[in-house]
Amino acid sequence: MWDYLGNIKVLAAAFVLVGIAVAQQVTVSGQVEVAAPPRHSHLPADAVVWLTPPEGAPPIQVTDVPEQHPSLTQKDKSFSPHLLVVQVGTLVDFPNHDPFFHNVFSLFEGKRFDLGLYEAGTTRRVRFDRPGVCYIFCNIHPEMSAVVIVLDTPFYGISNRRGLIDIKGVPAGRYVVHVWDERSLPEDLAQLRREVAISPSQTSLGKLRIRETDVTLAHKNKYGQDYEKPAPPGPGYIPQ
């Protein structure tokens, strides 16, 4: 015989547990501090911090990939925004808003691709289907660069100009903290990785001290070669 009261109690307990789980989602905060060479001091903006399960724990299911595609726009021989953070599976648009051709490519771990030449007013797309850091360039214009960070977690934040970071909707539990900064060496960033316990009473990551470097490396074109130097300007017209 169906136990009506018993099932009501089970359902009530389930709703209570769901309510507790939702209530235990918190906003995790932190602050980035930058140590840079004296001549190259930078604002602590655009550092990326994200949380993943510790080793041996089940992975986070990425389910809320946006229906609208984020864009990395090409305009005035630059990418906008310079930094884009997406979850695995996201389709990113690369519209060309310049009155000339571009050739967007990446040869790095997050996604290797070459969109080829495409003209003004057209758009090409890339689905980023694996986690990693993608450095994006144009094969025609060496001054163009951008970064797409692809994460297998929805729990991430980007520091503002004051270095403040908020990561919203994080369930209570244990996580590994990861940090990325464009001007920092990978080995320095690896030292910031640590495991933390997040709970309603413990939501702060504290201060994340990032050491930046003034080393900049010139990148190659998509063939692994140096870019061709632009031709010198021709002689000006002198009216007779």
Report each predicted region and the residues it spans:
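Extracytoplasmic copper-binding redox domains, predominantly the cupredoxin/blue-copper superfamily
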Residues: Q24-Q240
